[in-house]
Amino acid sequence: ADIGMNIAGPAYNFGYNTGDAGGHSRVESGTAGAAAGSYSYIDANGDRRTVHYTAGPDGFKASGDIGVDRRTAAAAAALAALAPKAPVAAAPVAPVAPVVPGAWGYWGAPHVYSAVYPGLAGYAAHW
């Protein structure tokens, strides 16, 4: 199959408009690796947002209503101001304790006397 054989093929034009029912529209035209167009929609506040764009060797560039609208940004800022603030916590401080060295063992004579292993004494006697 020759899928995608003519991606940058001849010029094209297309568009659609859903009318008042959906509030969406789009128009695009392009040729040989470049495209230009626009789309629009009705946002949650009931405002029509329109974005114009171009795409080509320089990449994708959009202009128009590409950010958050002012009413939504203002409402979000008002809600953020009402949010409870976290209390400032003091930095944890490690308790200061004296350094006590561990007990050192005495590695001298054994606590219990034991005779030398007789086999070793007998072996040494044969030299």
Curated annotation (Swiss-Prot):
Domain named Chitin-binding type R&R: residues: 9-87
Listed InterPro entries: CHIT_BIND_RR_consensus, Cuticle_Struct_Prot, Insect_cuticle
Source species, domain of life: Eukaryota
Protein task: Component of the rigid cuticle of the spider.
Record bears the keyword Membrane: no
A Pfam family assignment: Chitin_bind_4
The species this protein was found in: Araneus diadematus
Alphabetized UniProt keyword annotations: Cuticle
Molecular function terms from GO: structural constituent of chitin-based larval cuticle
GO cellular component terms, A-Z: chitin-based extracellular matrix
Protein name per UniProt: Adult-specific rigid cuticular protein 12.6
